Each structure stands twice: as structure tokens, then as C-alpha cells.
Amino acid sequence: MLGVEYLLKMQYKNGGFPQYFPERKAEAYSSQITFNDNAMVNALKMLRDVAVENGRFQLMGVEKGLRKKCQVAYERGLQCVLDCQIRVDEQGRVLEYGTEAWKEGHRTVWCQQHDKVTLAPVKARAYELPSYSGMGETCGILELLMDVENPSEEVSEAVRCGVEWLESHVMKNVMLERFTNEEGKKDVRLLEREGAEPLWARFYDLEHAEPMFCDRSGVPRKKLSEVDYERRNGYTWVGNDPQKVIDRYRGTK
């Protein structure tokens, strides 16, 4: 159970989890609340499962005291997830966490990373800018929330708003093609294709909620073709994972 104790130690008071613990000074983003690669989601799943008396860890003889600590940490983390969900006003402008406007704002989805204090969307690596997460981390978060037994009204609203946001930001009639470019290298590009399966971008800009791409220059691009070869082919920019989440949600209604 040393790993569980480690998770309990690294959790912030607001319920968030950093990417690394202890913090890596050379990487400023390592201490931010991290949903990237499902880091926080997986941590919460572990705490949730340990907290269950007759769960998958029962044969390990988890002490009651530790189970209780895990339950408290899980609930605190779940609240942090809800608090990090980006909220906007009627004009689609991102609202600051904790303000009166934020309390009345409309829930959307999440960023890959959020500030460990303000909970605002923040950047990580040069090509991971503050943004709405479409095909990536938002999916894992929504699945975590849909797994909550006897969900509160807040959890239910968070899921509903997240799914609706994904449904309204699908990239229609677009397909990802893998091809050999003029230099004889394997490459990727987005093409218009009538009737193509729905796709979602990994990132959507915070101003207009439109698909956004980037490379190590840190300059946001509107088109994948504008990203340099190395990052264009070295990162997953689009995908259809949200469809599974949408289908699961709609199938339970």
C-alpha cells in the first residue's frame, strides 16, 4: 500500500494531483493539476477502488483507516474535477473560477492541465496550449464521472454539459489520411470527405472553441498542414474517442 500512501501525500488540498511529485523544477508545468494521459483520473480510480471494502483490493487486507482516507481523498478529487470544468458566459467567454459569474456560468469540458491554485486552463509543453480538450482527456473525465454511483445533481450536470459540448464541436465530413509525401516520408493530412466518420480535435482554442494545432514554436495554427513535420506526425491531433462517450451516455438515457 506504499503506492496508495504516495498518492495521498501528493494530492493538493483542493483535491488536484500534479503530473510529478516531488515537483520537477526544470518543468514548470509538472506541478499543475494534470489530466493529461489520464493522470488524475487514474489516481482517483485507484483511490476509489481501495476505499471500497469488498472491492478488488480486499484480499490485500486494506486497513479501515486507510480506506477512509482514500474515500475522503477520492471525494475531494472528484470535487476538484467538477471545479476545473471550464465555464463560459453567454458569449462563450471563459470565466474565472470562484467568481459570481463563474457560479452562474455554463459548463463545457476541461483542459489538459489546470493551474494548481486558480484552476484556470494552463499550458504544458510548447505545443500543449491552454485549450478545451476534445478527443483526449475530457473523454476519460466524463467516463470517470459516469461511473459515480448515485451521482449528485452537480455530477449529472457536469456530464450532460460535457457530452453536449462534444456533440456540438464534432468535425464533420473530415478524415485523417496517412500518405507518403513528395519527399518519400510517411505523413498525415486532413481531407474533406463527405460522410466521413465524426472526428474531434485534441485541442480547441479558448476564444472561439475551434480546432487548434501547434508545434514546438508554441504558435497556434488553424490547420494541421501548418504544423511542422515533426509534430504533425509525432502527436495525436484528432480522433473519435468522444463518440464512445456520447454513445454510452445516450444509451443510458
Predicted regions and their residues:
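Terminal, non-catalytic domain-edge segments
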Residues: 45, 49-79, 117-129, 133-253
